[in-house]
Amino acid sequence: MSEEMEPKLLNTTMSRRGFVAMSGAAGLAAFLAACGGSSSDSSSSGGDAAADGVTAEEAAAGKSFDPATEPGGPIEIFTWAGYDDSPEEGLPAMWEQYIKGEYESASPLKWTFLEDDQQALAKVASGYNPDIIHPCIAYTQQWKDAGLIQPLDLNLLPDFGGIPDAIKAGGIIDGAPYHMPFDVGFSCLTYDADQISFDKVGGKESWEVLLDDTYKGKMALFSDDVAIIKIGHLINKGAVDPNKMTQEEIDAAKETALKIKPNLRNYWTSQTDTVNDFVNGNLIATYTWPDGYWKIKNHPKMKDRNIKYMQPTQGRLAWVCGMVLSANTKQPGRASLAMAAANTPAAAAALTDDFQYASGQQQGVAELIKNKELIKAFQIDDPAAWAPPNAWFEAPLPNYKDYVAAGEEVKAA
């Protein structure tokens, strides 16, 4: 990491999905090809959506909006903390195209922050009405079934075709596009290798270390009900898909999670808080997204410390998140233009350089990324790092409520 980037990195409050330069990199491209995905040509200059890497069926199934006829007023974005406009950090990058456009004065952007996918869905279902929401793609069907989102107008999203099919597939429902993938990455433990030993769990990096009471009070996990249960399942079953659990397996994973709980300092809701806990000596292992690992590793207090991002034998958790359009927005066209700004190659590259974040957007991004070190740091040139059993991407869960109920029981115990 360059000296110029370090202050910006360490000062940022970004507390969401920190991944890296996957956009356009050879390793990810190979992985997507193996999954049947592709990366089609697109540009942010607009034009026929179908000609820009979007199928005619997708374009036809979407909506059609006219920004010029909309009433104005703030466009509210319900997103993860840190994804707002931060001019003091020089970081309005993901919204810059909209902010410099013709509608910003009449329809300025406004941000509110969610805690996790379950909380966001519950809040909007209870009557909160933002214009844009930032859920993970595995939850798209639930948002649609609840009547909370509507199809996208791909003519207002000219770079949508630059998102490979394998990434956007989960957001296409009944042929219509509902979800614009934005950020992609891993979830795993960041740990101090000088203080954590895996000798009691077979000598290799493993989620089982959470059961080792040697580190009681010095470890932490994210307060996400589904993730808590998936980790328990990976400990119980090894490298087995945690998206396909029976009720018996959920119950067993809950029991394992209950055994982990006494060893934890907390279940965190803000990654910024757990990063601070770590660098201040309160933790030696915590669940983070890649940006959390990068912040800890490069913090001045961690100088000469052997900070690692775990690659457990059971596999990392992984995710695709992005933006959906509220069914109740009065400005769907202008909200779509804000989404389009976040989907440009320039915005994707800036997220990588400034926050170690990558985008679902693949086209023309790699050459725009300045810090090539990030590609190596997060195995972007290694397709195997993204495939099972090394990584388990989120997927729709038919028994989602059972996962959540079990996770809630663990936290309440």
Where are these regions (language model features)?
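Early extracytoplasmic/lumenal segment of secretory-pathway proteins
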Residues: A59-Q142
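Mature extracytoplasmic/periplasmic domains
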Residues: C321, L325-A387
